[in-house]
Each structure stands twice: as structure tokens, then as C-alpha cells.
Amino acid sequence: MIKVKIVRLNQKAILPVYATAHAAGMDVSACLDAPVTVPSSASALIPTGFAIELPEGYEAQLRPRSGLALRHCISLPNSPATIDADYRGEVGVILINHGREPFTVSHGDRIAQMVVAKVDHVVFEEVESLSETARGEGGFGHTGVQAKAECL
């Protein structure tokens, strides 16, 4: 288990919590003095009222909640959003409304999930060429959208 320091910046803040024993992400709630309405095709930065101190070598990822995406077309445009170990400011959640109707966020609404993950730093080695693979440079849908016969 990893210890993460957390500071309540607003007395009304609801700290992140795992909803079930085996949940990968903690629910993150809005900390608002008044409701915020996100118009269709717009985004808004929603405060959480807390800041965290992650151990070196870890990050926190903010991810959309599936229920908000399914029922209201609400997502995070920079998903997963990264909170670096050296960031000490308030955690904010950028919500985007892909739906046709305005979406209102109230204090205490669960608006995102937070997953804490280990981060490995890499060192790039510049080379003249890369090794060959069967896939090569194929990307962006090069395998099609239909299931292959051996998968059916």
C-alpha cells in the first residue's frame, strides 16, 4: 500500500475514496460553493478542494466516470489527466460536455476517478533505424473494424 499525503484546501472538500474493495480508482468529488453548468460542446475546470503529495516515482491519473459518459456524454478531454509527483496545487478536473444538453455539477458530485500508478523514467537511445516487425508502420485502424474469422 502506498501512502499519499493529502491536504483539504476547503473544509467542504470530500476526499477521494474507493467505492468498493477492489476498485482500481478512487471517486473524486466536486467542491463547489454553487452549481456549475457546462453547456453542450463546452468544458469547465471543476475544483476538488484538495491537494496531494505523491511519492517520487508515482503519478495520479484522473479518468472519466463511465456512468457520466454513458448517461450524459461527460468526459475528461485530457484523459487520463496526469498529476505529477512534484505538483502541489489543488487537483482540478476538466470536464467536457459532448452531449446536446447542458450538464450541471453540484457540490459533492462524483466527477472523475483517480488512479495512482508507478512511473518509470526512460532514457532514449538515438539510433539510425528500428528493428523490423510484422506490423511495421501500420496504425490508426490498419487492421480494420471487423473481427477476424479465427476470433469468432
From Swiss-Prot:
Substrate binds at R65, S66, G67, N78, T82, I83, D84. Pathway: Pyrimidine metabolism; dUMP biosynthesis; dUMP from dCTP (dUTP route): step 2/2. One of its GO terms (biological process) is dUTP catabolic process. It catalyses: dUTP + H2O = dUMP + diphosphate + H(+). Keywords: Hydrolase, Magnesium, Metal-binding, Nucleotide metabolism. GO terms for molecular function: dUTP diphosphatase activity; magnesium ion binding. Its EC number is 3.6.1.23. The keyword Nucleus does not apply. Belongs to the dUTPase family. This enzyme is involved in nucleotide metabolism: it produces dUMP, the immediate precursor of thymidine nucleotides and it decreases the intracellular concentration of dUTP so that uracil cannot be incorporated into DNA. This is Deoxyuridine 5'-triphosphate nucleotidohydrolase. It comes from Chlorobaculum tepidum (strain ATCC 49652 / DSM 12025 / NBRC 103806 / TLS). The lineage of its organism: Bacteria, Pseudomonadati, Chlorobiota, Chlorobiia, Chlorobiales.
